[in-house]
Structure formats: C-alpha cells, structure tokens
Amino acid sequence: MPEGFSASADAFMCPCGGGVYRLCCAPLHRGLKRAETAEQLMRSRYSAFARTEVGYLLATHPEPGRDDKLRRAELLRSCGQTRWLGLTIREVLGGGSDDLEGTVEFEARHRGGVLKETSLFQ
C-alpha cells in the first residue's frame, strides 16, 4: 500500500472536507483516478499535504531540473512540521473538466495560522 495509507484511515473524513476519504481523495492519491477539475486537484493536494502523501504531491506538481530526492525530503519535513486543520475554497474561476486552466482561491488553516492563496492550475 502506498505511503500514508491504511484500511482504517480510509473510513475517516477527508482532510479536504469533501466527504469520506476513501470516496473523496484516496482514489486520486492511489492513482486510480485523475482530478477532473482545478478544485478537485486543489482539494486532493491539500489532502495530500495533510496526510503526507508525498508521492502524489511530487506527481501533481513536477519541477523539472530539481532533484526529486531533495524535493521529497523537503516535503516530508514540511508535512511533518505542519498540522493542517481545514480548507475553505473561496472562489473558482474556470478549471472545469473541459477547461485548459483554472484558478482556485483558498484558505488552508493550520496550527500556526492561515495560508491564503490563489493558485493557477493548467
């Protein structure tokens, strides 16, 4: 089973707030399904940060020219240091299943405060 997965954890609510994890972001994290919208990708990435699904984070945000081992170590450190508490989607522009790109404005709450961001997904 990929990192971060256990059968019992699948029954819990998804960190992104979209329902039960096994029906929400788990299929994306396991590579059984791809995100169909910018919002779904945003939610799945938030969930991956909250669950330390580093493989998924690397796969969904490639950085050519950067060493994957270094990126993996940075992500593991970041995930281990941050306690994510919740996600609020503020606005979605485009990013539907037929769109080439979309933007998602969100707030990701963590123990140290709130990350407010508008991300472009292509």
Model-derived regions, located:
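Short solvent-exposed beta->alpha transition segments
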Residues: 55, 59-89
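Residue-level marker of positions within ordered structural domains that often coincide
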Residues: 29, 50, 62, 94, ...
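Short, low-complexity N-terminal intrinsically disordered segments enriched in polar/charged residues
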Residues: 1-44, 51
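Short beta-strand edge/turn micro-motifs at domain boundaries
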Residues: 2, 116-122
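Alpha-helical solenoid repeat scaffolds of the TPR/TPR-like class and their adjacent stem/linker regions
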Residues: 9, 97, 118-120
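Internal catalytic or translocation cores that form aromatic/hydrophobic pockets or channels
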Residues: 43-48, 54-56, 60
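N-terminal short leaders/motifs
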Residues: 40, 44-49, 73-81
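Surface-exposed, charged secondary-structure patches
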Residues: 78-114
